[in-house]
Regions:
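C-terminal extensions
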Residues: 2-183
Length: 183
């Protein structure tokens, strides 16, 4: 008597017809995992983060998906670049007191958001020369490069999407609903 194929032995989960995937973001072995599981992982689970990138990111204090998704300078760079899209040349009212002086080095305080976007990452206040050099190794040279850094964006998206993931199979959800009706 032969064994049934593994696919026939598997119980239905309720996700068999789903087609969403993040196959270009994570390693092959991790493609079928829950987003919530990925969210708790270290960054080498991301496709393209090899040993060198991992060492560089760890030197920046970034070890996990959460660290990468919430990296202070990534979020700041993304805010600057996003707001630069709304900026009108010469559109600042004379009475405006709007500023990001606590986010950028002194020589960039009077610059437009578009100019800051194109500035080197060293324009961001508090980013050390060592950190800037490490970012350079990852080919992140400008504030815009940092805002667009795909690994930060992937980690951020996985963290955010994981908040909406159903982690119970169909049968588990049905059993839970039945238990609620009995209570």
């Amino acid at each position: 008597m032969s064994e049934e194929p593994a696919a026939k032995k598997m119980k239905p989960t309720g996700w068999e017809d789903h087609t969403l995937n993040v196959s270009e973001a994570v390693m092959k072995a991790d493609e079928g995992r829950f987003l919530t599981e990925l969210a708790g992982e270290d960054v080498p689970v991301l496709q393209g983060i090899g040993p060198k990138s991992d060492i560089v990111l760890e030197a920046l204090g970034v070890k996990t998906f959460e660290d990468l998704a919430t990296y202070k300078y990534f979020l700041l760079a993304r805010a600057i670049v996003t707001l630069a899209e709304t900026e009108t040349e010469g559109g600042r009212p004379d009475s405006s007191c709007m500023n990001i002086d606590n986010a950028v080095d002194k020589k960039f305080e009077t610059k437009s958001l578009k100019e800051i976007s194109e500035a080197p990452t060293s324009a961001l206040q508090g980013l050390s020369e060592k950190a800037r050099a490490l970012l350079d190794e990852l080919h992140v040279k400008t504030v815009k490069d940092l805002a667009d850094f795909k690994y930060c964006r992937y980690a951020e998206a996985i963290i955010q999407a994981s908040k909406y993931e159903e982690d119970k199979t169909d049968s588990e959800r049905k059993a839970e609903a039945a238990m609620k009706r009995l209570a």
